[in-house]
Amino acid sequence: MPHRPAAPSPNLPREMAQAYLVNDRMNQLLLEHLDPRAWRAKLPGQKGRTIADIFAHVHNIRCKWLRLSAPHLKLPAQLDRHRCTPKQARAALAASALCCSAMLAEALAVPPGRVQSFLRDGWARPWPPGAAMFAYMITHDAHHRGQACMLAHQLGFRLPGAAGYALWGWEKLWKQCGFELPTGPKSNRACV
């Protein structure tokens, strides 16, 4: 008997908006366990960003996406990468994640909400709302989260093992965000 693929979840837009908040929970978890000495530390002889710079950038880029793609949403204040503290960064990231989640919910709604296109920057062509928008937003955060983890490690401030593994505990992260983990049909079959 041929395998029939499962139908997409009817709650897919809501689940994608929630997944963005779970993604930010990973940022929060990283910052909760980051040694404070790593926040502004620099590698000797390097001109790269500090961890403070990285997370200020993540937040400020989210604000740019919101300003360009969802101007009807109230923007959180931008972060000054030279002055922000880890506590301020955590609060700002939480605020911009909520706004980005709201933007995704509107962009993916049927019928569509007020978000008609996704603009990454003034130079970039607009994208229609959808999977590419969601993937780009998640990938941007994940890329910079990886940079921060690697930089902390290189600086000698490696995350505690349990914190590093917790970044991959999706079931627990979903629950920490107050969401019910999406479930699908049980199958022992490999993807074909």
Residue ranges and their predicted role:
Residues P10-E15, G48-V58, C99-A107:
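Short, mixed-charge, low-aromatic patches
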Residues P10-A17, P86-R90, F134-I138:
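Active-site rim elements
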